[in-house]
Amino acid sequence: MGNKKKSVGGKINFLELLTFIQFLTHKLTLTPPKPHLFVTSNLQASIWNWPSKSRITEISKAIWMNMIKKFKIFIFFALPTMLIVKGIYICYDQEIWTLVFFTQNLVKNFPFFGLRLFNMIWVESNLGVEASNLGVEAPKASSIFLDLHLWTLMYLFGSLARIFGELYYSDFELPAGVGGESCEKKTPSPRGPLTLYKKGSDSGASGGSDSPPSAKGNSGASSGPNQDRLAPETDSEDETTQTDQGPRSRGYRKTRTRSMVRRRWIRDKPDWVEGLWTRSSTEGVENLDATKASQTKSAAENLDAIKASQTPKSAAENLDAAAIKASQTPKSAAENLDAAKGSKSKSKSAVKKAAKAAKKLAAENLDAIKASQTPKSAAENLDAAAIKASQTPKSAAENLDAAKGSQTKSAPKNLAPITGSQAPKVKAALAEFLGIETSQLQTTAVVRELATKLEDDLPGSLDFADQENGNKIISMLKLREFALQENNRYRSTIYKSLGQFMDPESHKNLKEILDKLEESKNLLMTEGQKHKNTFDRNSQQNTAYNFKGDMKKYLELQNKVQHSQMKNFKLAESIIQKNIQREYKCKELKDFLHQEFPTSCRDFNDQEMKLKKYFLNAFNQAKTKN
């Protein structure tokens, strides 16, 4: 019997797998392996208990086949599943359920070159169309695919170069530095860069600080950790030593570290640096003084306004509180805040002492503010307080209700409240946008008049000879349906946008009317398509049917829908005119509506002229042939 060939997928123990990994490692790093790791015969394998060369080949084949199997599973099952699930999630998240958007996400999320392929198919193709429209030569498809292949090769070779660079980094020679001796093959230690440290308390830990040095430190009089930083350095072998990084770190020439260069620069810094630091400090103090002055001035103005609007008793109380708040400078406020935060750790006596000092400072500033008021301003404030105190309880209650009502109203975003004198302007702005009814309904009125005139001329039955006339009649009615639909759509969109300026109850009533308009629009669209399909089917088959009765039903449906739309339009406009908030700027409201609908009105007017011309021509031709 012949020798049976061992199966490639046999069992592999852990020792064999470890040996195979070591074998591959030595092969890749091009370093000679140890004698017992590479065996050439089964005898040596039995002596050293290592797998033979044939077994190593079988192990490599088994690993390779297993990798191919896993790769096939990933390519044909795992990757498509992940791409499809992610594409569906993105469509759900963006609420865009189109095949093009789903395909774009599949291509974009493909590993390695998916994003590049997406840009090539959709982005660069659109640029090519725009270039052809502008008369510029667009990139060819062959060059785009070549660019894709080159990009993929660059990515793969870049990854391989990075891997081999890390493997063979230790085999490169280091060039000689400036002023240093050329060295033979020296390799840096993988533990970290070579560092120099000074003997003493400062070993370079504090030398990496980027904070600017103080003026005091330049004279060399500072002590503590910064004393060694500002001390002059020497290049002698006694003061600088090398850290022991192993045998591979020997032979390095001495180099200055970052901290040593910074120390020398601080020691020998030019005069303009000191002047720059001094000037910046002076400017900061001046800016702080200006800020304090502006805050004190604004606080005094606010204090006068508060005093003028309050009764004598409440004015005195709020005067004390405002003066205490205004008298605190930013520095004193910060100090008081720190004192309040640290009150848990401080003793009670210290807290009481700080509170007493703050109260004393506030009292002094209050006296200064009171003394700074002129007799005239004090008299005016007293008169204002007396006028407010003389109000009857009824008028005070009315003013209180008015103030509460103005606070409960919520203003829309990007719109500021206005005074009552500007309310008519807001009303005029609304009338301007709601007055579009006249120009928009002219189209439907003309169509309705033409359809009424043609109603008596509709033939009772249709044969092949009347097909052209029937096409014009059904086209006219379809155009009237289109005009009704556009009028409904445009006005409903305006009503929906104006609803954001209304109170919730009125907005709810307006939404019910908008739902009715949507129902009428859908009804007209569905029934109109049915009549059109009936006409097309009978005209193609050249069969007689009650064309006049069918068109009358279609016309009655249009009249019914138009009557319902007009009724709902008036209800919606009355709700808007009665309940929209009047305290918003007229210009901002107009800008908002113009921004939302910049060309709808103009497009409708252009469409109106075209429809009028077409309807008149169709009417004249139909009357002439009949």
UniProtKB/Swiss-Prot annotation:
Domain of life: Eukaryota
Biased composition (Low complexity): 202-217
The UniProt record lists the keyword Membrane: yes
Keyword Cell inner membrane listed: no
Protein name: Uncharacterized mitochondrial protein urf-N
Transmembrane segments: 71-91
Region: Disordered, residue numbers: 179-258, 309-351, 390-419
Keywords: Membrane, Mitochondrion, Transmembrane, Transmembrane helix
Gene: urf-N
Membrane disposition: Single-pass membrane protein
Record localization: Mitochondrion membrane
Main subcellular location: mitochondrion
GO cellular component: mitochondrial membrane
